[in-house]
């Protein structure tokens, strides 16, 4: 019998009044609370990213109706608004932090809104939240040369290890972009699994370094969210996203070709 696919939910900011840069991919605290109620009502079992990957890697069975709750970048509202709701339900989650965006000694000033500080990251880790890597400056990894790529992966992993006390084993690719070269670099940098986007259900056959996620945004209705966690009508709900993604992929490939030609002439 084939293993059922798993919905991996991708959140960003949880905020009452997000700024323009984060609004579309944010959710309100009230919406997040309702969404977690839907997870409970649907009989789903939240698991952390590392736990899902380990079960698939070892061939162990998954819990009933597994779902992953993940947050990218490291916005302060994850601690302020999401953590109390997660704690209320006893749900584990994964937060993927861009270390150069977290407030503190390594802050590059690139954060798009109010970000977590390292004390808050440690409090999340102590509350059954897996802290994953999301690079240092949030670049498009497949557009970097080998040296810059490895620096982004290794430097950010070292910072999380120093600040949290545990090396991150899960990675989320910024913007969801990767390539065979990026996935190999992630493995060599010490990550055991990595998440993309693609707005599709995750399946074991995707491999540990290309697990797909589902975007939860401010426009996601309760009915749409229920379909996400139940794995229904995914292609229909994300049809527009996929069309835009395909178009942008052509643009990005053209840019890569131009860069390769330019480097070959140097």
Locate each region found by the language model:
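Membrane-proximal basic amphipathic "stem/tether" segments
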Residues: 212-266
